[in-house]
């Protein structure tokens, strides 16, 4: 059963890799939104359409350049941290219709794996899917963000564009050492709450 956010077209990639390690890559992609076979087999006996789910998962991973895994049926626990996060990103990108929230997607990863996840974020972004990236890693934020919402004392304190400010400026605004700039002009139709 889908959550209210998922039903609204919003997908999330969590810092703690919200995947089931013992399940396959394909099963994790469809966790909570399984496809059933047509006819009586699916409607009455609730038989899963494993082939359709595997084919879809394989295509989504291929689209994002992630088919370096041995098999779409291998257990997620056999993957590296970066590959696991890649599966989570692919799942979010496959089912999001509005935007993807990524909560510290590189926090538990090494340099090489973080690089791959940042490339995936850029790929998803290029495909036209908006991304809300929550991160304390300023180099990563500045690399992939179009706009940066800086929070201070649990409130939005400023919105900056990475091309207009340095990482040091962002940290200074965050800590209160620098006054926040006046609001930037947002694209037409954009709403900020």
Q: For each predicted feature, which ranges?
A:
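Glycine-rich phosphate-binding loops of nucleotide-dependent enzymes
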Residues: 1-193
């Amino acid at each position: 059963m889908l959550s209210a956010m998922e039903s609204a077209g919003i997908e999330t990639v969590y810092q703690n890799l919200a995947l089931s390690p013992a399940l396959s890559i394909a099963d994790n992609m469809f966790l909570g939104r399984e496809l059933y076979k047509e006819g009586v087999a699916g409607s009455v006996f609730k038989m899963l359409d494993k082939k359709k789910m595997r084919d879809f998962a394989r295509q989504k991973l291929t689209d994002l350049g992630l088919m370096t895994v041995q098999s779409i049926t291998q257990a997620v626990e056999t993957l590296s941290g970066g590959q696991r996060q890649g599966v989570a990103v692919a799942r979010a990108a496959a089912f999001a219709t509005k935007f993807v929230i990524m909560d510290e997607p590189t926090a538990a990863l090494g340099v090489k794996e973080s690089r791959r996840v940042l490339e995936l974020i850029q790929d998803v972004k290029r495909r036209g899917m908006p991304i809300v990236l929550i991160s304390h890693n300023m180099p990563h934020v500045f690399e992939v963000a179009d706009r940066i919402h800086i929070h201070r004392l649990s409130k939005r304190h400023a919105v900056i564009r990475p091309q207009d400010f340095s990482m040091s400026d962002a940290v200074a605004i965050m800590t209160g050492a620098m006054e926040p700039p006046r609001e930037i002009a947002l694209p037409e139709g954009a709403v900020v709450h």
